[in-house]
């Protein structure tokens, strides 16, 4: 990829173009040379399936991974330091969390899996004379557990987004020798090796600026989400809550609403991000229903259930769905919500508030800031916005703010604030290129169909919510007539390849093979074919990107002619 460094990956809304190959070697971080990269290169279909199957030849080449899918190097180093402090207890592993509450939720999940095995916690913290702002971010909690519970531990890490971030772990390592530990187990009560007058330590610049950075993010989100309808109250900065990941935001609202009733229930409508159903199901609702087709028939079934006096607390949906790019009927969902008293939570990560105006129809908006809001592919983040026009506004604010703790690490916030300064301009550019690429693919004889908001059956619904100056988003997926053509197209497509979407550089993945590796038949029954290829369109010059797509298509044509 040439000498592309982090600065290039954080390029603004101008076109990106350079000579050489975009595709990175297997296992390389994306962006290249970025210590906090959130994607890893999976350059061939074979590599994707091998990694998901745990094949040693592929796994051993991975230099990093999406932070919720694995343990980042900085976090692993923190885990190693913790185990070394505690003299490496036999068959014991650990996970680090920014708060005791997150650690306790993890403990509860492990104990549900195996009530017999011992699980212990410890809190690392600076001595009491430390500057409070420094002490807040140097502290973290760990859970120590038997290695036999690793599979469950990884599921929790992936689905709930509560783990410590890589930058936070990196900072904690710089303070590690000063940290004491507290625990209900004597063997986990320790004193730091170093000591000096911590009250005299200078605060890092990023701690001083964190309040402004977070306010900039909130202001940008609130302004973008505000409805064009002048009769509606604008979204306020105080209505925006920031989280370390998008999944942490989803789990926060799900936990809060699950506790509101002894008979709480949740609906997931449409085909969501693969982790969302697991997250919602794991947050304590007494009843859970998924309507995975996101169709009119699904809404008819939901209405029939509601009329029969089955009640739900909340409905989760996405605009648009991933990877079908379908749009939910928010008008009808809003009508059902008003009639039967449930809350509507909508994830707008793919549609973006730049493109769609959903405030008139939803009570809560969730956004993964990791994706196009950041764009640079070097930081995680999530947000939850409470609609000030919602009839549930006071209840939601009370539920969420009374338990909210700001755990968004200041350096992550600073990175997001810098990356998102041209958010709207980048969305508009990606909209334009993605529409052109979707049309290019859709016109090709080897392609059976393209999923893009203009090309799927819900296109009229998307138009109802599209802002006057909004486009159709940066994401599309393509289904080839022949599975072998899909594999060849992916292998020959010269773009970044790996997990995540919304990066400033185009990035592709065989979606079902990655997100539904163990449930591909089930996913196919809901409109996600095994050989679907997802493409997130970035800021590259359209002529450059279209030529790369056309080169891959020419390889497909040649294979099909040769038989």
Curated annotation (Swiss-Prot):
<comment type="function">
    <text>Cystathionine gamma-synthase-like protein; part of the ank cluster that mediates the biosynthesis of NK13650 C, a highly modified cyclo-arginine-tyrosine dipeptide. AnkD catalyzes the attachment of L-homoserine moiety using O-acetyl-L-homoserine as co-substrate. Within the pathway, the cyclodipeptide synthase ankA acts as the scaffold-generating enzyme and is responsible for formation of the cyclo-Arg-Tyr diketopiperazine (cRY) from L-Arg and L-Tyr. The ankA product cRY is desaturated by the cytochrome P450 monooxygenase ankB to yield a dehydro-cyclodipeptide intermediate.</text>
</comment>
<dbReference type="GO" id="GO:0019346">
    <property type="term" value="P:transsulfuration"/>
</dbReference>
<dbReference type="InterPro" id="IPR015421">
    <property type="entry name" value="PyrdxlP-dep_Trfase_major"/>
</dbReference>
<dbReference type="InterPro" id="IPR015422">
    <property type="entry name" value="PyrdxlP-dep_Trfase_small"/>
</dbReference>
<dbReference type="GO" id="GO:0003962">
    <property type="term" value="F:cystathionine gamma-synthase activity"/>
</dbReference>
<dbReference type="GO" id="GO:0030170">
    <property type="term" value="F:pyridoxal phosphate binding"/>
</dbReference>
<dbReference type="Pfam" id="PF01053">
    <property type="entry name" value="Cys_Met_Meta_PP"/>
</dbReference>
<protein>
    <recommendedName>
        <fullName>Cystathionine gamma-synthase-like protein ankD</fullName>
        <ecNumber>2.5.1.-</ecNumber>
    </recommendedName>
</protein>
<feature type="region of interest" description="Disordered">
    <location>
        <begin position="1"/>
        <end position="37"/>
    </location>
</feature>
<dbReference type="InterPro" id="IPR051750">
    <property type="entry name" value="Trans-sulfuration_enzymes"/>
</dbReference>
<keyword id="KW-0808">Transferase</keyword>
<dbReference type="InterPro" id="IPR015424">
    <property type="entry name" value="PyrdxlP-dep_Trfase"/>
</dbReference>
<comment type="pathway">
    <text>Secondary metabolite biosynthesis.</text>
</comment>
<dbReference type="InterPro" id="IPR000277">
    <property type="entry name" value="Cys/Met-Metab_PyrdxlP-dep_enz"/>
</dbReference>
<keyword id="KW-0663">Pyridoxal phosphate</keyword>
<feature type="compositionally biased region" description="Polar residues">
    <location>
        <begin position="10"/>
        <end position="24"/>
    </location>
</feature>
<comment type="similarity">
    <text>Belongs to the trans-sulfuration enzymes family. MET7 subfamily.</text>
</comment>
């Amino acid at each position: 990829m040439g000498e592309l460094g982090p600065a290039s990956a954080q390029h603004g809304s101008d076109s990106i173009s350079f000579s050489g190959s975009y595709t990175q070697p297997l296992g390389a971080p994306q962006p290249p040379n970025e210590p906090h990269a959130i994607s890893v290169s999976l350059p061939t279909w074979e590599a994707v399936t091998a990694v998901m199957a745990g094949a040693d030849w592929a796994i051993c080449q991975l230099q990093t991974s999406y932070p919720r899918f694995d343990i980042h190097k900085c976090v692993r180093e923190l885990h190693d330091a913790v185990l070394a402090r505690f003299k490496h207890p036999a068959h014991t592993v650990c996970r680090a969390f920014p708060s005791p509450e997150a650690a306790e939720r993890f403990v509860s999940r492990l104990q549900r899996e195996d009530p017999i095995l011992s699980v212990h916690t410890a809190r690392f913290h600076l001595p009491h004379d430390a500057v409070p702002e420094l002490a807040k971010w140097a502290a973290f909690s760990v859970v120590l557990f038997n290695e036999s519970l690793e599979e469950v531990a990884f599921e929790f890490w992936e689905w709930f987004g509560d783990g410590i971030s890589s930058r936070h772990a990196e900072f904690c390592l710089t303070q590690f020798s000063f940290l004491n530990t507290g625990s209900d187990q004597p063997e986990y009560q320790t004193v730091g090796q170093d000591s000096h007058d911590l009250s005299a330590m200078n605060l890092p610049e990023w701690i001083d600026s964190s309040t402004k950075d977070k306010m900039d993010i909130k202001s940008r989100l609130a302004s973008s989400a505000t409805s064009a309808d002048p009769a509606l109250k604008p979204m306020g900065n105080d209505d925006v809550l920031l989280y370390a990941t998008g999944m942490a935001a989803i789990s926060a609202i799900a936990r809060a609403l699950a506790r509101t009733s002894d008979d709480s229930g949740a609906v997931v409508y449409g085909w969501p991000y693969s982790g969302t159903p697991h997250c919602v199901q794991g947050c304590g609702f007494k009843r859970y229903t998924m309507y995975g087709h996101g169709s009119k028939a699904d809404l008819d079934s939901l209405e029939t259930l509601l009329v029969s006096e089955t009640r739900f607390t909340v409905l989760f949906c996405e605009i648009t769905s991933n990877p079908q790019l379908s749009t939910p009927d928010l008008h009808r969902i809003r009508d059902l919500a008003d009639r039967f008293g449930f809350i509507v939570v909508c994830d707008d990560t793919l549609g973006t508030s730049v493109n769609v105006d959903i405030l008139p129809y939803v009570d809560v908006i969730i956004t993964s800031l990791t994706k196009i809001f950041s764009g640079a592919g070097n930081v995680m983040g999530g947000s939850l916005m409470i609609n000030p026009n919602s009839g549930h506004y006071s209840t939601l604010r009370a539920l969420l703010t009374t338990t909210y703790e700001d755990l968004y690490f200041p350096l992550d916030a600073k990175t997001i604030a810098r990356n998102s300064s041209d958010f709207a301009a980048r969305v508009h550019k990606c909209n334009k290129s993605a529409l052109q690429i979707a049309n290019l693919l859709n016109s090709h004889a080897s392609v059976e169909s393209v999923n893009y908001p203009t090309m799927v059956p819900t296109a009229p619904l998307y138009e109802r919510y599209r802002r006057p100056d909004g486009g159709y988003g940066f994401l599309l997926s393509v289904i080839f007539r022949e599975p072998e053509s899909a594999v060849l197209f992916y292998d020959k497509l010269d773009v970044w390849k790996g997990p995540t979407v919304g990066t400033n550089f185009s990035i592709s993945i065989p979606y079902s093979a990655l997100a539904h590796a163990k449930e591909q038949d089930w996913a196919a029954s809901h409109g996600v074919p095994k050989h679907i290829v997802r493409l997130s369109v970035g800021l590259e010059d359209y002529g450059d990107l279209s030529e790369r797509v056309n080169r891959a298509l020419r390889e497909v044509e040649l294979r099909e002619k040769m038989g």
